[in-house]
Amino acid sequence: MSKRRRTRKNTKRTLPRLWAVLLTAALTAGLLTGGFQDSGESADGEKEITIAISSDTGTLDPAGSIALSWLSYAPAAMDELLTFDENGEVEYRAAKSYEVSEDNRVWTFHLREDALWSDGTPVTSEDFRNTIERALDPASGSGYAVYLFPIENAEGIYNGEADMDSLGVETPDDYTLIFRLDEACVYFLDLLRLPVYMPSCRTYADSADSGWDKNPETSLSNGPFFLKEYVPDQYFVLEKNENYWNADAVNLDRITFRFYADTQTMASAYEAGEVDVATSLSSTVMELYEGKEDLYLTEQIATRYIYFNLNVEPLGDVRVREAINLAVNREELCRIVGEDTEPTYNLVAKYMKDKNTGEYFTDGAEQPFEENVSRARELLAQAGYTDGEGFPVLTYRYPSLEMDSDTAQVLKEQLKENLNIDIELEAQELQMNYSSRHAGDFDLCRMNWTADFADPYTYLSMLLSNSMYNCSGIRDAEYDSLVARSDSEADPVKRSELLHQAEQLAVGEQFYILPLYAMKGVNLVNPDITGITRNPATGGLEYRYADVSK
């Protein structure tokens, strides 16, 4: 839809409030009306939309180092074995059926015979195994490899303690895929939406760093769209996969994803008519578009928090971590950062539902802790830093985005006022921030985690001793045990109790993280676009069956 529109150069505003004033003035003057064409068809009659997304990070290899790019690419281009719709019902995709043994340890999936790669070749069980085997090589950099560990011998293979031949994945024929688990895993079906359980064409997908994943000649897809073009740091284009088994239900011919450095330029691009959808925008946009049909709000199943590096003194002292947690005024923080935020004291996302009760999971237990500045000062004194004296200057690294910059400034001021400690702020480009965190190169580091699947394990697993995302040096045998016990607990009430105990230990007793806030998803969507769906596991928008009405 946006391809024929007038374009303009986007420049990052260094004064976000000035940007808001200018945008408000333009809206008031009636200049910013979206600028959309009357038709969603290009000159040759094809239907297309353009979507603004955050900076280019990560690979498109399901076995590789997944980050933001994959989250836009995969929902449109890849079919998992099955998923769940918004009503919790199974929706078959690459699989047509499955069976599970009485002990819930053997899962057999029957694949569609009509499922084809975008080049017309069959999708087979070996393509699923290809991703799994490559992800279990630590050199792949897959942060999702830990979610393969329920499979028999997968963890041993990852740690170099078992041979690949012992992996509990069987492919007796091209269209049968069998998983044998070490123990029953009650959320195994939820894991299937993760990249490491998706196929990669064994003809081309070899290693995670060979470049095959962003090369349209070798990057095949088994979903509604395939990769047509990828220009690093600028955009990538998906085109309709005519070989898709459900191609008749796919309405769009093309989706272009454009990369933007920050939410301000994303919103500006929407207003200029350069894009049809802009997601995860700032609360300023929510205020400006109140009452307009372009505004599309969602509950993000995500938590914004900070990692403490336990290997940096004095953050190895639980009293210091607790003091910092108790000294932060989250209500004040959210008032300043934006009305799309809400204070949280949990790691598990505020808006994640408990599948058994239908209520928010975090409402099923007491709040892990309460803010208390007086107690925070006592704890800091007990740790040897009365009135903050002698406390070293710590550096907080965060992405150079408006919301994160505002958050950092508030935290710096609150910790100075309440504990008399100094925090040095270091804004980083998004990819650099990701790399610093992944390498453990930080004192304090911003983290934002959107759920990968609809279970609290997606959050609690991140603090396990063997997790790729455990960047803080956490090694807690009691915590590991609680989470492990929850894996195989079939009683949903008992399992929830174990998960709540694990979170209380990590967040309310050991204070391994500094939870900040939950967020509403602030999105701008061209009203002519229909059929956008919301992923119930992540809260993200999906476009595989979207259409344009004009």
What positions do the PLM features span?
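Detector for C-terminal structural segments
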Residues: 327-356, 403-412, 435-550
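Structural transition elements
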Residues: 341-382, 401-405
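Ligand/substrate-recognition segments at binding pockets and active sites
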Residues: 373, 377, 381-451, 492, ...
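Aromatic- and charge-enriched surface segment that lines or borders ligand/interaction sites
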Residues: 96-147, 178, 314-316
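Gly/Pro-rich hinge or "lid" segments in bacterial periplasmic/extracellular proteins
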Residues: 85-86, 166, 174, 181-250, ...
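Alpha-helical secondary-structure segments
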Residues: 124-131, 174-178, 223-224, 252-254, ...
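N-terminal lobe/hinge region of extracytoplasmic solute-binding protein
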Residues: 52-102, 220-221
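Extracellular/periplasmic solute-recognition and catalytic clefts
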Residues: 228-237, 256-312, 335
